[in-house]
Amino acid sequence: MKLISWFKILCGMLLVFFYHHAYALYISADISSMESGEPFFSKPYINDTKKTNLYTFSVYQIDRPGYQEQGTPIQNGEILFTPLKKILLPGEQEFFKIFYRGEADEKERYYKIIISETPLDIRNDEGQKKQPLFYPTVSLETYFVVRPKDPDFKYDLTINQGILKNTGNTYFRVLLHQNCDGDDDSEPYVFYLLPNQQIKDLRISQKSRK
């Protein structure tokens, strides 16, 4: 299963962990997000396997991403999405859409999307009727964020202590390079900070590109 843009995160399980006790969110790829005033969010996904696959989708709300996240069912049609399930032939493409019908205020909202892929093999044995053969289902997860009505990107940086705090009302991504050389091709250290979260890391206090 190949998922374009934010669905690339589904090539493997989403890696989410916290660095010591800093309560900063680390993930292996981008978080999907939309502005609260947008009518819907849409991304294509492609079945790049050699089998016909059944894809099923589910979404629920969480307090915030992380190991101790608390999930709750979607209330009052706040989130609508389509399709609920879809069978794709090898190489076939479909669009997954999310419609946000909740409040447009200064609160950032977080959701977890679960996409399950089940190979479905149709065979015809010795002239008998075609029988569907199911294989184990693989479920993959990613996060979806609805930003506040008026996103406020603010932070507090205490360089001598190596502390970075998100003082705004929406998450942002941070990239730390090992040095300030513009030609440095080394992989940057990437993490995300949610509102009111902070991280303490020696790399922040070092002379580097941020």
Report the location of each language-model feature.
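Positively charged n-region of N-terminal signal peptides that target proteins for export
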Residues: 1-8
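Bacterial N-terminal signal peptides
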Residues: 8-18
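Sec/Tat signal peptide C-region and signal peptidase I cleavage site
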Residues: 18-24
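Beta-sheet-dominated interaction scaffolds and their linkers
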Residues: 24-49, 85, 150-157, 190
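Asparagine-centered strand-capping/turn motif at beta-strand->loop junctions
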Residues: 43-49, 162-170
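Short acidic, flexible loop segments centered on an aromatic residue
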Residues: 50-74, 116, 169-185
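Intrinsically disordered, low-complexity Pro/Gly/Ser/Thr-rich segments with frequent PxxP/GP/PP motifs
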Residues: 70-103, 183-208
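Terminal connector regions
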Residues: 101-151, 207-210
